[in-house]
Amino acid sequence: MTALSEQARAKVNLTLRVVGRRVDGYHDLESVVAFADCADRLTLHPGAELSLVMSGPGAQDCGDTSDNLVLKATRLLAERVPNLRTGGFVLDKHLPVAAGIGGGSADAAAALRLLARANELSADDPRVVEAARLTGADVPVCLPSKPCVMTGVGENLSPLQLPRLPAVMVNPRVPVATKDVFAALGLRAGQLNVGVVDLLKSTGWPTDGSSAADWIAAVKRGTNDLEAPALKVESVVGDVLRALAALPGVRLSRMSGSGATCFALFANDDDAQAGAQLLKAAQPGWWVHAGALS
């Protein structure tokens, strides 16, 4: 069988509400999720031996490959699919790590899609979906990599029709551990982060066919509840947010996930590209991407 390849697109949390912490210690979330046009690329060379080789500009940041989520997802699927055909993976790493954009989760989801193709399985086969869920909280949403409202601990996905949103994404190349941000949030097991009245309110999102302006206005009404605790963990997040907010033509700036990646939305591609150029000149050490979310 010839080699198979998949993109592993960056995940962006346009909004992220922490509803509360469950008695089992996990956090219940509600998030509007989009996907960017920047990505890692994962290639599978089908064969008898499972392996993973790293390449690309971000390879040195990934550390030991033995506990990489690509291999974890593969092993979990192999436990559920007899005689699963695997092989050698090559990960061309471009997205920053520990960055709040689901890079490792997107890679794992890409691995599951590749394995599904190599074994003539549907990507929504229950065994594939279960392997995604057990690999990590962000892997289920990255499996289809389509805009949605994500709830629970990441397992409940409600599709959205999201227009193309011109955007700039910035990471200061400072890793932020998700567990540290949730620790800074400081919720006890069983504690709600929102009031009961707010919990009962259903957030209304624009209907299918709504414009980018409608969506930006709706997203503005939301928040990222992890922004404040992330600032306690790593103050450079504030520098990134201020730099994005100061760009000409910016409509919204916010942190994605648990950080440190932040994004800004614009009315058009020209403003986004111009903003990215300004940031690259002012902060040559930062990772900056201009493109679109969808």
Curated annotation (Swiss-Prot):
Annotated ATP binding sites: P96, V97, A98, A99, G100, I101, G102, G103, G104, S105, A106
Full protein name: 4-diphosphocytidyl-2-C-methyl-D-erythritol kinase
Species whose genome carries this gene: Rhodopseudomonas palustris (strain BisB5)
Gene3D superfamilies documented for this protein: 3.30.230.10, GHMP kinase, C-terminal domain (3.30.70.890)
Molecular functions (GO terms): 4-(cytidine 5'-diphospho)-2-C-methyl-D-erythritol kinase activity; ATP binding
Superkingdom, taxonomy of origin: Bacteria
Family under the similarity heading: Belongs to the GHMP kinase family. IspE subfamily.
Keyword Transferase: yes
Catalytic reaction(s) noted: 4-CDP-2-C-methyl-D-erythritol + ATP = 4-CDP-2-C-methyl-D-erythritol 2-phosphate + ADP + H(+)
A matching Pfam family: GHMP_kinases_C
Gene Ontology terms describing biological process: isopentenyl diphosphate biosynthetic process, methylerythritol 4-phosphate pathway; terpenoid biosynthetic process
Keywords for the protein's UniProt record, in alphabetical order: ATP-binding, Isoprene biosynthesis, Kinase, Nucleotide-binding, Transferase
